Amino acid sequence: MAKKDYYEILGLDKGASDQDIKKAFRKLALKYHPDRNPNDKKAEEKFKEINEAYQVLTDPQKKAQYDQFGTTDFNGGGFQGGFGGFDFSDLGGFGDIFDSFFGGGFSSGRRKNGPERGSDLEYTLSLTFEEAVFGVEKEISVTRNERCETCNGTGAKKGSHPHTCDKCNGTGQVRHQRSTPLGNFVTMTTCDKCGGRGTIIKNPCEECRGKGIVRKHRKIKVKVPAGVDTGNIIPIRGQGEHGKNGGPSGDLYINLRVSPHSKFKRKGFDIYLDAHISFGKAALGTSLKVPSIDGDVKYEIPPGTQPGTVFRLKGKGVPKVDGRGRGDQYVNVIVDIPKNLNEKQKEALMMFMEASGEIQPRDVEKKSFIDKIFKNDSK
C-alpha cells in the first residue's frame, strides 16, 4: 500500500504550521462533509481522508513519527477512518460554522457507545553507555487504564447489565431535521439521556463505579536494540491505555536517555578517545593498549608521532541499529611533556640536543643557563 502524503491531502507543504493545518482542514471539511453531500461516496471517502490527515498532523507524537519516518502505522490498528468519532471542539469557531449550517451537535455528537481507542503513554528510560551500545532488556512499571475484570468492561454490577436507552434506542445519538438557506439537513446530536453511550446503567459496578475501566500497575519488558542513543524512541504497540467499548489499546512510547561515559565520547556510531603517551614514546614509537568497548586493543604507535595525531580503529565503534556493521573508533594522541626533570633527565636531553645540533657543545656558562631554564620550568 502506498504511503499517504497527509500534507498533500490538506493541500499544504511539509512543515506547515498548526494554524495552517487547522485552516486547511476547516475549508476541506466544510466542503466534503457528508451532510452537505448526501449519498456521495466519493465525498464521504474524501472527508475520511482529510479527517485522518488532520488527526495525525495535529497530534505532536504522531506528527513527529510521520515527519521522521513517513509512516501511518502509529497504533497497530490504523486510524478511525470514519468521521463520527471526530471532535470539532478544538477548532475554535469552526464548530459554530457547522452549527449554523447543520443545526449544531458537531462538538458533542460523537457516539460514546462506539469503540474508542485508548490513549498513548510515554515513559523515559535511562540507560548506561554500555547498555545503549550493546542493547539490553529492561523491565519497567507503568500505570494505565485497563478494562474492569469484575464487570468485563460493561460498568454494570455483576449479575446485572446495562439497559438500552429508550430515547436514542441504543444509538447514543438523536436525529434532528432542520431547514436552512442551503436546504434541509439532517444532523445527529448526542443523546442527553444516556450521554451518548446508548445504554443506561442502573446498578453500577462497585469496582469501577460504572466506568468500565480501572487503574492498574503493570510490569512491561522493553527490548532495547544495540546502538540506540539519547532521543531515540521505541514504540510498543498496544501497551498504552486500554480502549473503551471494545476499541483498541493505545501505544507506549519509550523515550531513551543515555548516560555519558567517563572515557569514551560518542558521535553517531563513532567513538572518540584520548590516549596519553610520553614524548619519548612519541619520538621512538611504542606499543599501546587502547581501551575500546570490546576491551583493550593493541596498537603500534609509529616513531615520530606528533601531538594531535588521530588513529582510526575500523569497526570498533557502536553497532548500527539496523544491524549493518559498526562505526569506528578514533584515538587522539596526546603527548605529555614532563614538568619536573631530575639531573639525569636533564643531562640526557642536553646530550640529545647536542647530538641533533640544536645547541653547541656545552660550557659552564651555557650549562648554567640551561639549568636555570629547567629550574624555572620546574617551579
UniProtKB/Swiss-Prot annotation:
PROSITE patterns, per the entry: DNAJ_1 (PS00636), DNAJ_2 (PS50076), ZF_CR (PS51188)
Keyword Metal-binding listed: yes
Description of its domains: The J domain is necessary and sufficient to stimulate DnaK ATPase activity. Zinc center 1 plays an important role in the autonomous, DnaK-independent chaperone activity of DnaJ. Zinc center 2 is essential for interaction with DnaK and for DnaJ activity.
Keyword Zinc-finger: yes
Entries under NCBIfam families matching the protein: DnaJ_bact, PRK10767.1, PRK14297.1
InterPro entries: DnaJ, DnaJ_C, DnaJ_domain, DnaJ_domain_CS, HSP40/DnaJ_pept-bd, HSP_DnaJ_Cys-rich_dom, HSP_DnaJ_Cys-rich_dom_sf, J_dom_sf
Family assignment from sequence similarity: Belongs to the DnaJ family.
Cofactor dependence: Zn(2+)
Amino-acid positions noted as binding Zn(2+) 2 in the UniProt annotation, renumbered to this chain: 165, 168, 191, 194
Protein name: Chaperone protein DnaJ
Keywords: Chaperone, Cytoplasm, DNA replication, Metal-binding, Repeat, Stress response, Zinc, Zinc-finger
Spans of repeat CXXCXGXG motif: 148-155, 165-172, 191-198, 205-212
Main location: cytoplasm
Textual note on the cofactor: Binds 2 Zn(2+) ions per monomer.
Residues at which Zn(2+) 1 binds: 148, 151, 205, 208
Gene Ontology process terms (BP): chaperone cofactor-dependent protein refolding; DNA replication; protein refolding; response to heat
Zn-finger segments (CR-type): 135-217
All copies of domain J, residue ranges: 5-70
Cellular compartments annotated: Cytoplasm
GO molecular function: ATP binding; heat shock protein binding; unfolded protein binding; zinc ion binding
Classification via PANTHER family: CHAPERONE PROTEIN DNAJ (PTHR43096:SF48), DNAJ HOMOLOG 1, MITOCHONDRIAL-RELATED (PTHR43096)
Subunit-level organization: Homodimer.
Sequence intervals crossing the membrane: none
Family annotation (SMART domains): DnaJ (SM00271)
GO cellular component: cytoplasm
